[in-house]
Regions:
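Surface-exposed coil loops of outer-membrane beta-barrel proteins
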Residues: 1-49
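Flexible, solvent-exposed loop segments that connect beta-strands
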Residues: 3-16, 107-113, 147-151, 182-188
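Short secondary-structure boundary/capping elements
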Residues: 22-23, 80, 153, 191
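Detector for outer-membrane/organellar transmembrane beta-barrel domains
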Residues: 53-164
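Flexible, glycine-rich linker and terminal segments associated
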Residues: 134-138, 171, 201-203
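C-terminal closing repeat unit and adjoining cap/tail of repeat-based domains
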Residues: 158-181
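Outer-membrane beta-barrel "beta-signal"
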Residues: 191-203
Length: 203
C-alpha cells in the first residue's frame, strides 16, 4: 500500500516508514538451549555473516501467564542492519491481556541520522460470550519513527474482533486499522484506512 498526498502525489510505500523487525527468511544454522526455569537461549548464523541472539521466557504465576523475549541481530556486512528488539505479553486469569514490543536499528555508519525505532502496545480481552466459542477483542497502537528520514513518524491504530466457532473448527474475524504518516519533506499526506473481514477454517 502507498501513501499519497491530498493532491494524489505518491509519497512512498508503508514499509518504507516502518519495520517490525521480523527478521529475514534465509538459510541458517540455529541452536536452542533446553529450557531452564522458563528461560531459553537461541543463537543462529546465516549467510553474509548474519548472527542472531535471543533470550526467551515463558511461565505462569498464580494463573497469570507471561511470555517475553529480547534479541539482537548482527549483520557484519551491513552495520546499519544491526537491530535490538524485545517484547512481553501477559494474560490474566479473567481474560484480560497486555502486550508491549519495541525495537531500534543501529545507524552508526550514517552520519546525522537518528536511529529508527518502533513501539507497539496492545490490550485484549477474551471471554465465552456464546455457545459458539470464545470471543476475542483487541486494540493496539503502533508508532514508528525516523525510518525513512529524521522526523518521520508513522502511527497505526487498530481494533479487531475474533469469534471462535468451535463446532466448525473455524475463526470469524474482522478488523480496522488507521495509518497516519507525518514527514518533514511532504505535507498533507492522506491517511490509509484498512478494513479486514475473513473466515479461517482449520482442517
Amino acid at each position: 500500500e502507498d501513501f499519497v498526498t491530498s493532491a494524489g502525489a505518491a509519497v512512498g510505500r508503508v514499509d518504507a516508514f516502518n519495520d517490525e523487525y521480523d527478521g529475514t527468511r534465509q538459510d541458517r544454522i540455529r541452536y536452542d538451549t533446553p529450557s531452564f526455569g522458563g528461560f531459553k537461549v537461541s543463537v543462529s548464523h546465516a549467510n553474509d555473516d548474519r548472527n542472531d541472539y535471543a533470550l526467551r521466557y515463558g511461565g505462569s504465576f498464580s494463573g497469570v501467564k507471561v511470555k517475553g523475549a529480547i534479541g539482537y541481530g548482527q549483520n557484519e556486512a551491513n552495520t546499519q542492519r544491526n537491530v535490538t528488539k524485545g517484547s512481553i505479553g501477559v494474560l490474566l486469569p479473567m481474560g484480560l491481556s497486555f502486550q508491549f514490543a519495541a525495537g531500534e536499528r543501529d545507524l552508526d555508519a550514517a552520519a546525522g541520522r537518528n536511529d529508527p525505532s518502533m513501539q507497539y502496545y496492545r490490550i485484549g480481552y477474551r471471554f465465552k460470550g456464546s455457545e459458539l466459542g470464545e470471543t476475542r477483542l483487541a486494540a493496539s497502537y503502533h508508532d514508528a519513527e525516523d525510518f525513512s528520514a529524521n522526523g518521520d513518524e508513522l502511527q497505526i491504530i487498530s481494533v479487531a474482533v475474533v469469534q471462535i466457532i468451535e463446532p466448525l473448527g473455524a475463526e470469524l474475524y474482522a478488523g480496522y486499522s488507521n495509518l497516519d504518516l507525518e514527514t518533514t519533506a511532504t505535507a498533507n499526506i492522506e491517511d490509509i484506512d484498512i478494513v479486514t473481514v475473513g473466515l479461517r477454517v482449520n482442517f
